[in-house]
Structures are given as structure tokens and as C-alpha cells.
Swiss-Prot record:
It is an enzyme of class 4 (lyase). The keyword Protein transport does not apply. It comes from Bacillus cereus (strain ZK / E33L). Tetramer of two alpha and two beta chains. This is Tryptophan synthase beta chain. Pathway: Amino-acid biosynthesis; L-tryptophan biosynthesis; L-tryptophan from chorismate: step 5/5. One of its GO terms (cellular component) is cytoplasm.
Length: 397
């Protein structure tokens, strides 16, 4: 399969690109240049690997979920344990890389957006480590849902700005973070939390997250002497999925499954299934699939999981859908909750609600596969942050 994206203009087929105001163009080009240099610099790679190993705690285990496998029948189920990273999710793979890049570029301050608070915590963490000033924008609805993470960020020295505009969720936080970056561009680096935004952000985030898929490949081959038949990951903006899928893109014998949030159901208005129900448009500097109405107004995304309710999806996922290399599906709030409880009871592992969407789809897929086949789930984060809202949800039901 001939797959080499993005092109030199930052496009993934028709997707991606750089739809930014003139005031940001220079910074985006400067970032691209700095990133290219860093990727070719052995000292930078060495420093990044040092922190990934000694600070983040990589590599993360590939765990054979024996009880889940027995329960489902069919394929052997493996979990890539990104929940065991420092700060409890995959987000830090990207924030540590971008923070080192910020230091290299001589920036003193970092700005970021966050939905579930995981990216905010991971950003505040690396800023504390590297002595960078940190400002985090978070929608007020998410601030309410994720009180604990807000306090965590503040403990780490970050300034958390609550965003009341729009629906007070991730999309609005990104708007404000971009606005802040425009006016502080001389001394500030924007750490984008997912494979979104203008080029080179989708590529930078994908590359820093690719450590997930690279490790998985190596670990699975060591255990089973072959590649897995299927790989499953959840998708909001799509960074854990992109990090897991990208190293497998050329291995056409490996089926890749991306799982979006169907919320209350894709037939309702309350979902975040962008690739299932969306259409092409431009948001936050990039062309991609979006949830929008006929007039092109962005629709509110809904999911029980704060990390999946973004109304767009990364440009590379948009392309992978169109060329059929990845097959995209969606899982409802209720199905995700069921999977959350099942994994907790069967394996003693409490997954994030985001990751529970991937688990739920894998539960449907595994029984249709053969016993000598393998399925890997990207367990993108741990569920401590969700226990309170799950308790509330179950009491209401």
C-alpha cells in the first residue's frame, strides 16, 4: 500500500492543510521547521526517549486479558496498557515531546485546551518538570464534570481558564486557546492535544503518539510470533487511535477499527459520531469530517465521556475512512458503561470511559474471530477520573 501522508503542504488527501489567520502563519511555519530539525537531531531523540522511559514509564505492557478472552470466546484479547503511563493516559506521550520542542524553540510559556482534563493534566505535568509557565483552557461544562482534574492542574502550577462560550466544552476551549496563542505567539507554544488543528499539529501529535503502535507491534510479535489480526482504539479527536494505527497502516493483513461515541444513539442529536454521521468542513485550522448542519453551523457533540465529545475528527482519520484502510464504528453511552463494568469485574482494571468505547466494540468483534487470532485494544487511559460521574449516571438510571 502506497501511503505517505501528509504531503509537503500538510494535506492528507483533501483533508488537513493550514486554515489559519495571517497572524499565526509565521508561527505555524516556524513550528514545522523546528519540528523537522528536532526529528533529525539525535540529541533531541535521546532526551525524548530518556523521559519516555524514566519519567513516563514506557514501555507500557501488552497484557493478555485471559478472563475477558474466556468470557467472549473467539479471539485472544490483549490490552495495550496506556493507562499505566504517568498521569494515567496516553496524552503524556505527546505533551512531553511538544514541551521539549517548546524549550528547544526558546518559548517560556505553554497554552493548551483540555476536555476530560487528561491532556490538561499531562501538559501541566510536563510544564512543572521543565519549568514552563502553563495556561489551560477548559469548557465550563467539562470543569464541572472533571473537578478533580482541575484541582490537579492547579496543584501542578497551571492557570485553568473556564470557558463559558458556546456549549462550554472542548470545541470552545480550543477556540479560546487558539485566540490566546495568536496574541502571545512570541513567547508561547500551543500544545495541541489531539491529531487536530493546522499542519504540522496532526503530524506532530501522530508521530509522538506512534510509540504506542510501535511498541505493540514489537511486543505482540515477541508473544505470538506474528502481527495481531485486529487492532481497536477509541476516537474523539483521534490521537490514541492514530498513535496505535499509524505503525500498522502498511500491514494490510491487520484490520484496524476506530470507535466513536454514539452517545444516546446516532439516530438522535446526542452523539459524537463524526465519521459515521458527519460531512466535510473546516474547523480549528484544518479540513476534516465535522458534525454540522446544512448551513455549516457546528453541532454540539454529546458523549458520556468528556474526552470524546469533539465535533470533528483528525484529518488523517478522515482520509483513512475514505480509502477504507480503517473501519469506523460507534458505541453508545450504555454500551460503553457496560464494557466499563465488565472489564473492571473481569480483569480488575478500571478503564477510562473513552477507552471503554473501544472495549465495548472489541466485545462484539472478538466472538466473530477464530481462537488462534489476536485482537489488541488500546486501553488509552485509566478510569479514576470517571468513577464519580459513573456513580451519578448509574444512580439516575
Amino acid at each position: 500500500m502506497n501511503y505517505a501522508y501528509p504531503d509537503e503542504k500538510g494535506h492528507y488527501g483533501i483533508y488537513g492543510g493550514r486554515y489559519v489567520p495571517e497572524t499565526l502563519m509565521q508561527s505555524v511555519l516556524e513550528l514545522e521547521e523546528a519540528y523537522k530539525e528536532a526529528m533529525e537531531d539525535e540529541a533531541f531523540q535521546k532526551e525524548l526517549n530518556h523521559y519516555l522511559k524514566t519519567y513516563v514509564g514506557r514501555e507500557t505492557p501488552l497484557y493478555f486479558a485471559e478472563n475477558m478472552t474466556e468470557y467472549c470466546g473467539g479471539a485472544k484479547i490483549y490490552l495495550k496498557r496506556e493507562d499505566l503511563n504517568h498521569t494515567g493516559a496516553h496524552k503524556i506521550n505527546n505533551t512531553i515531546g511538544q514541551a521539549l520542542l517548546a524549550v528547544r524553540m526558546g518559548k517560556k510559556k505553554v497554552v493548551a485546551e483540555t476536555g476530560a482534563g487528561q491532556h490538561g493534566v499531562a501538559t501541566a505535568t510536563v510544564c512543572a518538570l521543565l519549568g514552563l509557565e502553563c495556561v489551560i483552557f477548559m469548557g465550563e461544562e467539562d470543569v464541572r464534570r472533571q473537578k478533580l482534574n482541575v484541582f490537579r492542574m492547579e496543584l501542578l502550577g497551571a492557570k485553568v481558564e473556564s470557558v463559558a462560550a458556546g456549549s462550554g466544552t472542548l470545541k470552545d476551549a480550543v477556540n479560546e486557546a487558539l485566540r490566546y496563542w495568536v496574541s502571545h505567539v512570541h513567547d508561547t507554544h500551543y500544545i495541541m492535544g489531539s491529531v487536530l488543528g493546522p499542519h504540522p499539529f496532526p503530524q506532530i501529535v501522530r508521530d509522538f503518539q506512534s510509540v504506542i503502535g510501535k511498541e505493540t507491534k514489537k511486543q505482540y510479535e515477541a508473544l505470538e510470533g506474528k502481527l495481531p489480526e485486529a487492532v481497536v482504539a477509541c476516537i474523539g479527536g483521534g490521537s490514541n487511535a492514530m498513535g496505535m494505527f499509524y505503525p500498522f497502516v502498511h500491514d494490510e493483513e491487520v484490520a484496524l477499527y476506530g470507535v466513536e461515541a454514539a452517545g444516546k444513539g446516532v439516530h438522535t442529536e446526542k452523539h459524537a459520531a463524526t465519521l459515521t454521521k458527519g460531512s466535510v468542513g473546516v474547523l480549528h485550522g484544518s479540513m476534516m469530517y465535522l458534525l454540522q448542519n446544512e448551513e455549516g453551523q457546528i453541532q454540539e457533540a454529546h458523549s458520556i465521556s468528556a474526552g470524546l465529545d469533539y465535533p470533528g475528527v483528525g484529518p488523517e482519520h478522515s482520509l483513512l475512512k475514505d480509502i477504507g484502510r480503517v473501519s469506523y464504528h460507534s458505541i453508545t453511552d450504555d454500551e460503553a458503561l457496560e464494557a466499563f463494568q465488565l472489564l473492571t469485574k473481569k480483569e480488575g482494571i478500571i478503564p477510562a470511559l473513552e477507552s471503554s468505547h473501544a472495549v465495548a466494540y472489541a466485545l462484539k468483534l472478538a466472538p466473530k474471530m477464530k481462537e488462534d487470532e489476536g485482537l489488541v485494544i488500546c486501553l488509552s487511559g485509566r478510569g479514576d477520573k470517571d468513577v464519580e460521574s459513573i456513580k451519578r449516571y448509574m444512580e439516575e438510571v
